[in-house]
Amino acid sequence: LIQEDLPFIKSENKINNKKIKFKLPSVDLLKIPTQKDKEKIRDDDYIDSEFLEKILLDFGVSGNIKKVSHGPVVTLNEFEPAAGVKVSKIINLSDDIARNTSSESARIATIPGRSTIGIELPNSSRENVYLSEIFSNNDFTKKDVRLPIALGKNISGIPVVGDLASMPHLLIAGTTGSGKSVCINTIILSLLYRHTPDKCKFILIDPKMLELSTYEGIPHLLCPVITEAKKAASVLGWVVKEMENRYRLMTKEGVRNIDSYNAKHILAMPYIVVVVDEMSDLMLVAGKEIENYIQKLSQMARAAGIHIIMATQRPSVDVITGTIKANFPTRISFQVTSKIDSRTILGEQGAEQLLGKGDMLYMSSANRIVRIHAPFVSDNEIEKVNNYLRSQAEPDYIDEILNFADEKELSGETSNSGDKDELYQAALDIIRSEGKASTSFLQRKLQIGYNRAARIID
């Protein structure tokens, strides 16, 4: 395998002159919070801790509230139950606590490493979380975080930044209006703010045709935004092929991962981030094929610098299969409709008690679940950033990706027709020799499905 033959190196040579001048976007393109936004929420917006203790006592649960943490959206009350009180008894009181405190919902969960139980109650007025605040934080600009993504603020109001390189893949679920699409936009913008087109490339798959089309034409794209589900399966096939090429190249160079390779070479191998906005649409069209590709990529692509971000609004078992779940240890759940959906995505209930509009539960690869409030980014802000990027460079699409998709479809059609002709002749021979002709007879003899046997009989 010759190094220069790899697609990412071919494209590097073409835009070599342009990449030197490339400037990363400024935080000024995003909305900066004003002093009014930063003002503290009034004290009467919170539930009094003594009142909460009294409510619990009315239900036969005695104990004390040890600590209260006021966040931008919810307040965390750390409750220490008296000896002999079961945790399950307190968790089952979530609906009663919400009713007695006149709250929209109440989430109760154990706090790892502490003897207290967290009771999360929503504030009567929500504080806005802006993307510019997270980008200005020191955690986002750290050099050792290779692919930083702005997740939002935790319950205490502290900015949370994740590293996609260590995740290494991300699964997002949530109903319509829960903030799922805004979260995908903040993740894409996070990477656009940190990496030039020669360091990080994107493949965007958007069967809904609306959410990711705004990124069309930015220089970070490897191919135009994919909107057809059949083409998406073929593009994922190309990503698998690219991963195998990278593995061969790294084996030849004697390195173990993309970072070691880039440390040895001037021509950096870019990260590839594949974003799939609606997984259920793809699973309907080509479920088994997509699942096989995603399984391959999620198991092996990390070392090759390829990462997948998948989102779905239907977190049922037929979309998020056991195979997909096993290979996506890092997951985000926004508000879902039922406890069953919450268990499917996180393995425990609680996501049905979320408030919507960016309120999420983040499960890291260590299986710790943290409540985070995702930042809001408007369409206007996204468009400003995209226009700034488009003004600096043209996208350098790799034709091989779309050609790969077209070739695969053509070869699929020819092979299907070839199979049919071959079986048709075999079916004729069997019918002549046996003197019988029926669909079920052909199914048994040729070991094929009902539909195919019926077509041959017709």
Enumerate the language-model features and the residues they cover.
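Short, intrinsically disordered, mixed-charge
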Residues: 54-58, 95-103, 189, 193, ...
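Residues within the DNA-recognition helix of helix-turn-helix
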Residues: 93, 187, 456
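Aromatic/hydrophobic pocket-lining residues that form π-stacking "cages" and hydrophobic walls in ligand
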Residues: 52, 294-297, 427
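Conserved alpha/beta core segments of nucleic-acid transaction machinery
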Residues: 364-458
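P-loop NTPase catalytic phosphate-binding loop
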Residues: 18-25, 111-120, 139-256, 264, ...
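Short, charged, solvent-exposed linker or helix-capping segments at domain edges/interfaces
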Residues: 129-133, 173-174, 383-387
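Low-complexity, intrinsically disordered P/S/T-rich segments
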Residues: 1-162, 166-169
